[in-house]
Amino acid sequence: MFEFITDEDERGQVGIGTLIVFIAMVLVAAIAAGVLINTAGYLQSKGSATGEEASAQVSNRINIVSAYGNVNNEKVDYVNLTVRQAAGADNINLTKSTIQWIGPDRATTLTYSSNSPSSLGENFTTESIKGSSADVLVDQSDRIKVIMYASGVSSNLGAGDEVQLTVTTQYGSKTTYWAQVPESLKDKNAVTL
């Protein structure tokens, strides 16, 4: 049943070189497995972060409830937007938002300023209508008035003029509103835009 090999030339031997090659192969396989596991973890976390950012851009928007303009000498000198959170949105800090103004004679980007409306220039300011903060939308019931000084941006808006306003929140979500001045401003103090 068992065969005894007595001749030295016919016995199989494992040399030290073969043992070293085997250990090296095991080490290389272990290192490769570690690299694959680390790469998979990195890709998973990167994909998760990208998904969260995309979700924030879609859901953390504002809604423009209404818009009106103050009329002075048959021209609109202030454009006022009433804004609120969109459904499912987190807190939206309007001080970190921008408004792209594309008007009849000029296009620019407005940033937040706490200055009084008459000294805004290429900025906008906010006032609380309903809620505890004048510049952060916390609840769906909060309402904030966004004030832009038209003559600080370009010239006052005349009858029939149109301005495209795109509000970009700190999350990168955008809301666009077209403010259309009525054809007649005679004997008016304020108009719906």
Curated annotation (Swiss-Prot):
Glycosylated. Keywords: Archaeal flagellum, Glycoprotein. Residues 1-12 form a propeptide. It comes from the Archaea. One of its GO terms (biological process) is archaeal or bacterial-type flagellum-dependent cell motility. The keyword Transmembrane does not apply. It is found in: Archaeal flagellum. GO terms for cellular component: archaeal-type flagellum. InterPro entries: Flagellin/pilin_N_arc, Flagellin_arc. One of its GO terms (molecular function) is structural molecule activity. Flagellin is the subunit protein which polymerizes to form the filaments of archaeal flagella. Belongs to the archaeal flagellin family. This is Flagellin B1. The gene is flaB1.
